[in-house]
Amino acid sequence: MEIITSLEAVKTEYSPSVIALGTFDGLHLGHQDIIKTARDYAQKHDLKLIVFTFSNHPLSLIKPDLVPVRIITQQQKIKYLEKLGVDILVNVPFDHDLAGLSPDEFLKKLAVFNYRCLVVGENFSYGFLGSGKTDTLQRTGLHDHFTVIIRQLVKCGKNVISSTGIRSLIQAGHVEHANQMLGRAYALTGIVTHGAQRGRTIGFPTAN
């Protein structure tokens, strides 16, 4: 899987593609549905499968005090996307330049990927302050002759699957329910910083 971390680094136009667009901050079953739909379209029409997302949560720029806790690391996200058969991951920082683009300007940024189809969730928004919605995208698709596929939100029982809901379940200790929405076992990885290791001297060794 090719990984692109800067749009400025893309100098040549790519082969025709389908792009799954989203924050994908949890890569839960709803996010997977969007990506799998894009994958199926890519296979049917012999296109490259691209996932376009951000390396940081958009709220980190817009409302830093409201940045949610991560439920997946960048390394885990890359691993899962590879398993889903993604050809190209565009994982760029959400910065002031991107945040200030109009909906049309944002789509022009994607033109280098030669997309024939865009796949999004029904609550997708894009462009300055999220001014572009799914109906905006559909109108642009009709005008510019590309396909737009909008996926309905996925439910687990009666509840809509969302990263916010999954965070709440994890914080409340309902990890099994969170796992059902994630479609995998919840786990965060990190680096253990070694301490003085006094625990082993009293018969209670700890993680560090």
Q: PLM features: what roles do these ranges have?
A:
Residues 1-208:
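Nucleotidyltransferase catalytic core that binds NTPs
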